[in-house]
Design a protein with these regions (language model features):
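Amphipathic terminal alpha-helices
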Residues: 121-155
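NAD(P)-dependent short-chain dehydrogenase/reductase
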Residues: 1-47, 74-81
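Residue-level signal for the nucleotide or nucleotide-sugar donor/cofactor binding architecture
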Residues: 2-6, 30-36, 66-69, 97, ...
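Conserved C-terminal active-site "lid" loop/helix of NAD(P)H-dependent oxidoreductases
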Residues: 35, 57-58, 94-116, 137
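A recurrent short beta-strand within the Rossmann-like NAD(P)-dependent oxidoreductase core
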Residues: 20-24, 30, 42, 51-66, ...
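Non-catalytic, hydrophobic alpha-helical segments
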Residues: 38-42, 61, 71-74, 109, ...
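Short, hydrophobic alpha-helical segments
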Residues: 46-50, 82, 132-136
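C-terminal "lid/loop" region of Rossmann-like NAD(P)-dependent oxidoreductases
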Residues: 56-60, 72-75, 83-101, 144-151
Length: 155
């Protein structure tokens, strides 16, 4: 995801250009997770639903409560993972109202499948920074993604 006004892509762009990260609302809480978390469990859900129709329905996939952090905390984790003295600043310039707290209720998937996230928010940010740096350095991204997928499934 390289879209504007997304915290991690904004962090990567700022860090890659040697600028401070601009955080619009450091006190808002969001359910941040590594993209591999929902993708992996969606495949499990699809397989289970294919095998047994009693599993049909919707499921929320999100981080554990302890990993629902503020945007400021996420920016801190990003800066620590990026290194090189990366910093962020709080700069709200108006704009549309944003909910201060967003969280997913993942109790159904946890109860039904015994699912728990493989990575906490710190590991998720570290893996995202690792991927981003390798992308910016022109690495073979197929190899990078294959390695990260293997690491994810053996964690």
């Amino acid at each position: 995801d390289f879209a504007n006004d997304r915290i991690i892509p904004d962090c990567v762009r700022a860090a890659a250009s040697g600028k401070d990260i601009i955080v619009r609302n450091p006190h808002s809480t969001r359910p941040y997770q590594l993209v591999l978390e929902p993708l992996a469990v969606y495949l499990t859900i699809a397989m289970k639903q294919y095998e047994d129709r009693t599993f049909e329905g919707y499921y929320n996939v999100g981080p554990d409560d302890k990993d629902c952090v503020t945007t400021g905390t996420l920016a801190d984790l990003f800066c620590a993972a990026w290194g090189q003295g990366q910093t962020w600043e709080n700069r709200w310039m108006g704009g549309p109202h944003e909910a201060n707290f967003l969280k997913l209720d993942c109790s159904k998937i946890k109860h039904t499948f015994g699912w728990t996230p493989r990575y906490g928010v710190k590991e998720a940010v570290e893996k995202t920074v690792e991927w981003s740096k390798e992308y910016l350095e022109g690495a073979d991204m197929t190899e990078v993604m294959d390695r990260q997928i293997r690491e994810f499934f053996i964690s």
